[in-house]
Amino acid sequence: MTAKDKLPQMMPNTEAQGFTARESWRIFGIMAEFVEGTERLKPIRPAVSIFGSARTAPDHPYYEKTERIARQLSDAGFSVISGGGPGIMEAANKGAYFGKSPSVGLNIQLPMEQQANPYQDISQTFQHFFARKFMFVKFAIAYVVMPGGFGTLDELLEAMTLIQTGKSRKIPVILVESAFWNGLLDWFKTTLVSEGMIHPNDMNLIQVIDEPEKVVDAIFNHYQTRGFLPLPEEHELMLNL
C-alpha cells in the first residue's frame, strides 16, 4: 500500500462526527476571550509584561530579583502583567501587589492545572494561549523577560517577531540575567545573523540588564522624548495587532 492509499484510511469522516460544526461554534468562545480580556484590561495602562518560568522556587535568586523589579515598576506607576501562575509569575505579581499600581494575572487553563497565585488585583483566565499572548502584547509598553523555558521563549520570540515585522510598535524588550541569556544571544549572532536569517540591526531590539533599578530606568529612557501614549502612526498598528 502506498502512502497515497494510506491517507484516506487514516482520516476519519470528521463531518459525520460533527467535528467541523463544533469547531465553528468554538470560534465564539475564542471571540469571548478577546472581548472580555480587552474590556478588563483597558484601565491598567501603562503596563509592563513580565515573562518567566513557572518552576522558579520562592527562595531562588531569580524569584527575589523579579519581585524587586516588579515592586519598583509598581511604585513608579506601572501596572505589572504576568502569567498569573507560580514561579516568576508569582514573584512579578507579588512585587506589584505590594506596590502602588495594579497587579494583573493572565492565567491559562492547562491539562495539569496551573493554580493562580494570590497576589493579583485583576485576574483573568484564558483557555487559548494565543488570546492570552495577545493581551500581554496589546497592553504592554515594555517586556521584561526573566529566565524561563519554552513558554518564556515563545513569549519573547513572538514579541520580537511582531516588532521586527512592523506589526507592533517598538517597545523595550529587556532580558534580565545576562549569564542565563548570553548563550542564546551568542547563537542569534553566530548563527542567525551570520547566515542571514535576521538582520544585524535586529539584535538592537534587545537590551540585557542585570540590575533591577536599571530596568525601570531603561523603560523611562525609551519614552522620555515621546511619552507613553501611542504616537498617531502607532494607533493603526495597535488596532490591527
Give a label for each model feature.
Residues T2-L7, N13-L106:
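Glycine-rich beta-alpha loop segments
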Residues E36-E39, F78, Y97-S101, P111, ...:
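Generic secondary-structure signature for well-ordered alpha-helical cores
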Residues L41-P43, Q72-S74, A96-Y97, Q114-P118, ...:
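Solvent-exposed alpha-helices and their adjacent loops that cap or buttress functional pockets
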Residues P46-S49, F78-S79, S101-G105, D121-Q124, ...:
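Structural motif
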Residues G87-V145:
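Acidic/glycine-enriched connector segments
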Residues L110-Q115, T152, F180-G183:
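Short gly/pro/ser/thr-enriched loop/turn and capping motifs at secondary-structure boundaries
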Residues Q127-A179, Y223-F228:
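Active-site/ligand-binding-proximal alpha/beta "capping" segment
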Residues L175-L241:
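C-terminal functional extensions of proteins
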